[in-house]
């Protein structure tokens, strides 16, 4: 769900009730993703891209807040979309769809003078700025020696994901799965608001159960700290529902494309928490990225009909995918799913036995040139590749017996 929850708790340490106001402010940055840069008056880098962006106040059955869109950004631009900043309907507060249009720090000073005076905002005229600021307040009554809380929802809807392996052609635009579920950011925020209590309760239940388990503290820390990766820009789904991932995230873009097989070998969370997503990765690896000879491209190009273009296999990655196919089958119990993958699984294992291959003499030990997760080629027997290979052999044996 493309929504961030920002919850603020105001604590009153005095013996008398207080009225407080919390303000959320956001620039309408549609069109700006950091890839397009200009210069400010000091010749320092300045993000550019917004054009004829506009803010409007909305009030619906469940929410009130600001809806941000653009009339000038190219609808096919990767940074084109909508944003919403909202709070629960029925809360007291004011808003601005624009700040004062003036030079230097005057807009900020005007905002602060207005807000700090009484906790409310007076409107300012819209001056046609390309990246207008919007502000939204919530007024709270805080009891003596008590507390009060308010929640802001920040939602987004950006449909134009581009492939991680562009060719400069129209099919570089591959889209985002989540934007097929909601029409815009406001719709996503409304849907979330109606289900937020249940979603939060389930999340807390999972975390509490895991945190209070008898697993060693080091295991719990490592597992929980890394779960957040699934909710970052490292991972995404295309409109057909397939799940993909970079190796990680850099400051402005994903790092190392392709759902790299030998990197994603170390992911266990997806399979145990979101089995359908994990199985979609196996489907991509075996049904799309594996050729007739059994070579599995260890990086997948997109769109999906280009899945085999990379054309290079990784010994640990390929053997690991075989083991993961076994794991995902055991977790799901879906024999029909395994049946679809089985011919490609067999080819992927047999690829190790081709002439000049990883284990050309079929003695159960890899001796050939073995590209691997260390980004080098191993030659000759070694325990690192050997473990993956023996695991794949054993997994295939179990699947074959079934």
Model-derived regions: residue spans:
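Active-site neighborhood of glycoside hydrolase catalytic domains
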Residues: 382-402
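Residue-level detector of short, conserved catalytic/binding motifs and their immediate flanks
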Residues: 4-6, 20, 267, 319, ...
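Substrate-binding groove/exosite segments of carbohydrate-active enzymes
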Residues: 116-139, 146-151, 157-158, 172-356, ...
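Acidic carboxylate motifs that coordinate Ca2+ or other divalent cations, activating on Asp/Glu
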Residues: 363
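Surface-exposed coil/turn segments at beta-strand junctions on protein surfaces, enriched
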Residues: 13-15, 131, 143
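Inter-helical turn/loop segments and adjacent helix faces that build the functional surface
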Residues: 11-13, 17, 328-339, 396-402
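Polysaccharide-binding surfaces and accessory modules of carbohydrate-active proteins
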Residues: 1-114, 136, 161-163, 167-213
